[in-house]
Amino acid sequence: MADKKIYWHLPGFCYFRLLNQVLMNLMKDYPDCFEEKYCIGSVYGTFLGAVWNGGRAVFGITGIKDIRAILKLYNDRGVPVRFTWTNSLLEEKHIYDTYCNLIMKEADNGMNQVLVNRPVLEEYIRRQYPGFKLISSTTKRITGLDGLLEELNKDYFLVVLDYDLNHNEEVLSAIGKQADKVEILVNEICYPGCPKRSEHYRQQSQMQLEYDIDAAFPCPNKTRERKFEECKERPSFISREQIREYADRGFVNFKIVGRGMPMDFVKESYLYYLVKDDSRAFIRNKMESTLNQFAQAMKKRKA
């Protein structure tokens, strides 16, 4: 593993913008506090209110100045922005959406990426925006080996592995030759083999298309407060020690779950996976003090 770079794909380029900015600055200022060869491979998410978005519904609107500022924040640091264009209910009429196409045009610089799961949008993006790297989304719920091998043989930059396959030795061995094309979710909080996961994705897609902020979904997992320690109890969890084992087998792309989670969940995930054990307290203090300073500054600005 010593010579291999490990790429981490982080959540919430818009929603967790401040946290991600603090993290990037700390990685630059205190590189010895972070695990060697660990890099930010991308930051995924959506701008507010984009109907192409899937996975987690996000409402509102992001103005053009903020769109440009956020793209610049990451791209100037060499970090790709990855759009979660995974709405599973998209039809051809939706691909011409003015707002989503505006976002794509602003981000079309050869660096940024798109997660996809609908052929109608994927084909449109390949035609209209060939400069974007396309990633096959875990929202497709490909849980069979044959389907996964077929997906890996398609023209995708990466394929995100379904979390239920994280420790499936038959699958991991079979895809070993294409390990560098696989992205693995390390801290999924969803129950193993969740029978409602695909239905939940569809419900979130419908919420996004209809701007239905009040729609509810009967998920027993949503009744609990989300804490990072909870994901450690899941069979799909991959520990920081196991990351090295996966990397030795050629798997070098890892995704940290966090969309729709509290900031503390995401912050603890970053501290656990990216920071060296003996530096965690120091980086935690730096991170929290900086976030508090920003929060105080925002309060004064609003007063």
Where are the predicted features?
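Active-site pocket-lining/capping segments in soluble small-molecule metabolic enzymes
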Residues: 2-147, 156-303
